Amino acid sequence: LLMNNGVRLESQSWGADHAPELDYTGSSMVEVVKGAECIRYGFGAMGGVVLLNDAPLPYENKKIKVNGNVNIGYDTNARGFSGSGTIETGYKQFGLRLHGMYTKGGDYHTADYVLNNTGYNTISFSALAGWQGKKLTATLFSSIYYQRSGIYYASKISDLSQLIKRFEYGRPDPETVKPFSYEIKPPFQQSQHVTLKGELKWELNPNHHLNFTLSFQENLRQEFENRKKTQWSWIPVQDLMLKTYKFDVLWQAKWKLWKMTTDAGLSNTYQTNFNYPGTKQPAFVPNFAALSMGGYFLHKAEFGRLQCALGMRYDFRVLSVNGYSSLSNYTYYDDFKLYSNFTMSLAT
């Protein structure tokens, strides 16, 4: 499970070849969370959570100051190049940070031949703005991430006999290997991910805080294949739009006794998945709408060298699914499901 600047990444992650749609070059702090603390992040988090966050904004500058950095890289294998840059400024109670990233690469190669159609192209922009008062801190975060990655031509095997022949030969047929290129043709995948987040932190007193977070994500994924009709190859076989709306409330407290801390929160998520028509293929993931609500409690204490944590969480999920089973018989299905789950974790 990945958390990008406090927002749970929601994308079409059902494929083993689906890389997370986020710009790691824009994260200044990376943390791995395990144990009872994972209880706050809901389903899919019990194995651990990776937190990617920006550094704090430069508040409290008496004069306007501008800082920045640029990073440039080159990949000899794919003749790929990459660049990223950050610029930030702050003045009194206000802070602003802008970040951008671009990468482009061509065909990868082994020692003996080129792996055609394995190029990649990625571009990302993000902005973080904030205001900090005595008791309140408000931040706005937005990002857009786009990537296109080619799929190796020879990886498409039609049957077992063809696979065995490929193993026996030990390499692709030399007549099918083409010169190096940056061009990406079907089969390939492309995706676009948009994130918007608003957060308000309220300091009730030095030991008690309230956090309110509202976020929206839009994930568009398209997958293209080589089809029998060439003109259809540029029509995606999968064309999915996933939208996620989320609202979280968190109360945090510190206690003097045994260095105890308490976190209690509520989370609400509404999500829709829509398959755009015209792909001429059955949808791999059906259309659905899901409403999830949950509440959790996390308490930690220290007894000398011994650290203990107790976490409890209850989740409720409503799911409505509909679609067609195939293009041949157009069998329509419509289903409605209710799920609930209670989780408790104790760690020392």
Roles of regions detected by a PLM:
Residues 1-348:
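Outer-membrane beta-barrel proteins, especially TonB-dependent receptors
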